[in-house]
């Protein structure tokens, strides 16, 4: 494959709220929809408190916490940009600004480890190499609302309990794709009945997911 094709890995609000992110669309009915294709399984968890108080999903390998890391399927949209540098900048702007860190793995990448290795192994799959030359993703770390404090399973559960009035927090957890199963999500569903908001269409045969535009 000589043509550069860049895939953007998403797992949270990027899927239902891409804003001005430059990604390919597909015509479904009378609407133009952002289509996300099945991506690699990665250890993601509700582990980062955002500026508006949501408990958002980030890559979390469970290091230095009591949370057992588990892998969930992520999703990939094709960037309309043909430069990895431009696509990473575009993703950073969507995620809050130029300084937001992003990760990158390409078909020519070598000696990867950790998360990069998991993504590279997926990219090296025969059917995936035909689709993409490069993959990028938001590379934010777990972060509590109080820097330096412990941030284990119980702490995150208490954070949710203390912020029940935050509608954005509740909406985020409910809208997260059904393929994301984590200890924190299980807790929210069992404790508060926050079931999956089925505002998406998941085509299991085509291995795609999209959120219809209103």
Language-model features: where?
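A glycine-rich, hydrophobic/aromatic-adjacent loop/helix-cap motif
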Residues: 2-214
